[in-house]
Amino acid sequence: MLNWIDTAPRRILALISAACVAMLAFGMYLQHVVGLEPCPMCIVQRYALIGVAVFAGLASARGQKGWWMTWSVLALVAAGFGAFVAARQSWLQWYPPEIATCGRDFYGMIENYPISRAIPMIFRGSGDCTAVDWTFLGGSIANWSFVWFLLFAVLLLVLLVRGGRGAPDTLARA
């Protein structure tokens, strides 16, 4: 059943990287063409997508087993972090706080507060983070981000557990 993972792990990693780039491009389209402004949690999810894209791309490019596993683990961590942030934002959208304030923007928090205070403020969310401005098949952007981050994490985990064994495209060769 999982033979397709064994036969082309490099292609799967490249596909994960390409999917992340496509998601980032779609986010830019929504921001610059449609006019949706990203909230602080959306921006953090974009950084997680960049991390998954870069690390999965590096894992795909590096054929030596130790390196591809290192990059894949880092991509898995970024995907897990992105899934956490997307899940938190989805929670805020489903159960908005009683008093939703707009709060500071992402860069304002980072520039004006020490990182130890800015990070909790970002994850607390803001009034902007609870807004659902766009949906597809009943899911918000945060919901779909969670699904994609989870898919990336599962694929990366399966690749790591199976160790890239298999066919000519395998990552285990030197």
From Swiss-Prot:
It is found in: Cell inner membrane. Residues 30-47, 88-143 are periplasmic. Required for disulfide bond formation in some periplasmic proteins. Acts by oxidizing the DsbA protein. Keywords: Cell inner membrane, Cell membrane, Chaperone, Disulfide bond, Electron transport, Membrane, Oxidoreductase, Redox-active center, Transmembrane, Transmembrane helix, Transport. It is a multi-pass membrane protein. One of its GO terms (biological process) is protein folding. One of its GO terms (molecular function) is protein-disulfide reductase activity. This is Disulfide bond formation protein B. Disulfide bonds join C39-C42, C102-C129. GO terms for cellular component: plasma membrane. InterPro entries: DiS_bond_form_DsbB/BdbC, Disulphide_bond_form_DsbB, DsbB, DsbB-like_sf. The chain crosses the membrane at residues 13-29, 48-64, 70-87, 144-162. Belongs to the DsbB family. SUPFAM superfamilies: DsbB-like. Residues 1-12, 65-69, 163-174 are cytoplasmic.
